[in-house]
Curated annotation (Swiss-Prot):
Localization annotation: Cytoplasm
Protein name: Probable chorismate pyruvate-lyase
Originating organism: Bordetella pertussis (strain Tohama I / ATCC BAA-589 / NCTC 13251)
Family listed: Belongs to the UbiC family.
Major site of localization recorded for this protein: cytoplasm
Amino acid sequence: MTTPIPLARGWLPAAPSTLDPLRKYWLFRPGALTAGLRQLGHVRLRVLAEYPTGAPRDEADGMRIAAQSPVWVREVLMSIDGVDSVVARSLTPLRASHGVWQGMRRLLTRPLADMLYHDPGIHRSVFVCRRLAAGVPFHATAIARAPAGGPEPALWARRSAFWRAGQPLLVAECFLPAFWSLARAPVAPR
């Protein structure tokens, strides 16, 4: 079951018509992103940071909580066959990170999908997407993993919220420039 997600400024309910079909597909691909990435090659997940902070307005709106409410944040980098491909940021109210979403604190290098897709009590919102820009909470994290030099690349991200027992877990995933080359390449049988 999917539920609506409040649209914070800049997030779109559909991909712009100017995007190519490949980007549209990945921005709104249902199910676990990790499963899709594994179809392209060997996926490695590296935790970049985990910490408590106050929820930025953009993300607070996406979780239907007050801005600056205490939240727990987890940022990870997923690589495919050694190529940095996706930066993801997940957050939940701090209290929920000790309650219904405490599993996110124990994942280590496992993907969130390991705890999200096996519980029928979890519901996911619809996806929204946007081109990341300065001021979006994980823009700096994503841009730091993009190729250096030249103009800033177009970094497209998607996000959705998972709900369990009335508590949100907001997940945003940004596709790095190198990902699009991997996604375009024919996949060898495994």
